[in-house]
Design a protein with these regions (language model features):
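Short, solvent-exposed loop/turn positions at domain surfaces
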Residues: 15, 98-99, 136-137, 167, ...
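Sequence-specific dsDNA recognition surfaces
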Residues: 88-101, 116-145
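Structural preference for solvent-exposed beta-strand-turn elements
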Residues: 35, 73-82, 271, 280, ...
Length: 295
């Protein structure tokens, strides 16, 4: 009931260093109160929506964990495969240079800002979503095909130094708080192996929880990974790309279904909880809602 009044409740908030609502405002809030029998029927319908949304969310989480388990099992350290530090395979490693949010343009030189590594790109990518003008960057730092990008600033210890591989063919600018790793290995393999739990634990080692978490080039260089021959790297990368594509195809419908069910829940919640009609009229509305849910 109170969820349907969220906008009205928000209007009661007093602007202060700590936003608050007075007791009088809450006690003065008017709500529709149908009979207990009707209340039970409303709750039953709305609970059905929330239960279905929870089931869909759990399925989406399970598929993600399934992929991560398969990836981590395939790329775990094995006898006969050497473990190397990233500094041993780096032909160059350097930091990008700051590109501010207001310096991003619709056209210009392709670029990546560190936050996009967390929010926009997955394991690897071939096209930049952002551009900037060269005159905006005092000390331009570029990345090219095959380079690995690390975001060395983040909001959580668990996700710090998330990395992605660039497999496009344009020369692009790396923003600040990004480390660029150049190498002669398979970039897709490196991207997959650097996303494993074993690699993430190394990335977060020694980091302290705070509002902003930082990493650096020396920490990146010390990360150890299994490094098979190039032909094996390609086989692993192809297998993981294929499995990831299958999981992604299966998952495309789930987020959309979850969003649709959430909107459906909100619609019927607001509809059912704002009626000022008689119980018999409301019963007809409830019956329609039940039929819609079953459909």
């Amino acid at each position: 009931m109170l969820k349907s009044k969220q906008n009205k409740i928000n209007a009661f908030v007093r602007n202060a260093s700590i936003p608050r609502i007075s007791k009088e405002s809450i006690l003065g809030l008017k709500v529709s109160l149908p009979s207990v029998e009707v209340q039970k029927r409303i709750v039953k319908i709305l609970d059905s929506f929330t239960e279905l949304t929870a089931e869909l969310t759990a399925e989406l989480t399970a598929r993600k964990k399934q992929y991560e388990f398969y990836r981590d099992s395939l790329l775990r350290p094995k006898e006969g495969i050497p473990m190397v530090e990233l500094k041993d395979i780096a032909t160059d490693i350097y930091r990008g240079f700051g590109i501010k949010r207001d310096q991003v343009t619709a056209n210009g030189i392709p670029c990546v800002r560190y936050g996009e590594i967390y929010t926009t790109y997955n394991t690897w990518f071939d096209t930049c979503v952002s551009h900037t003008c060269l005159e905006n960057v005092a000390n331009p730092k570029y990345f090219e095909h095959g380079d690995i990008l690390f975001a060395i600033t983040g909001e959580s210890v668990e996700d710090i130094a998330k990395s992605v591989a660039y497999v496009g063919h344009e020369k692009c600018l790396a923003g600040g708080d990004i480390v660029v790793l150049k190498h002669k290995q398979n970039p897709r393999y490196l991207a997959h192996v650097l996303a494993t739990q074993q690699a993430r634990e190394q990335k977060s080692k020694g980091k302290v929880k705070s509002k902003v978490v930082h990493s650096n080039v020396p920490s990146i260089e010390k990360i150890r990974i299994p490094l098979p021959p190039l032909d094996v790297q390609k086989r692993y990368a192809d297998a993981l790309d294929n499995f990831d594509a299958i999981c992604s195809d299966l998952n495309i419908g789930l987020p959309a279904e979850i969003e649709a069910r959430q909107k459906q829940y909100e619609y019927y919640r607001d509809l059912l909880l704002t009626f000022a009609e008689t119980g018999s009229t409301l019963a007809c509305k409830l019956q329609a809602a039940s039929c819609k849910l079953q459909a």
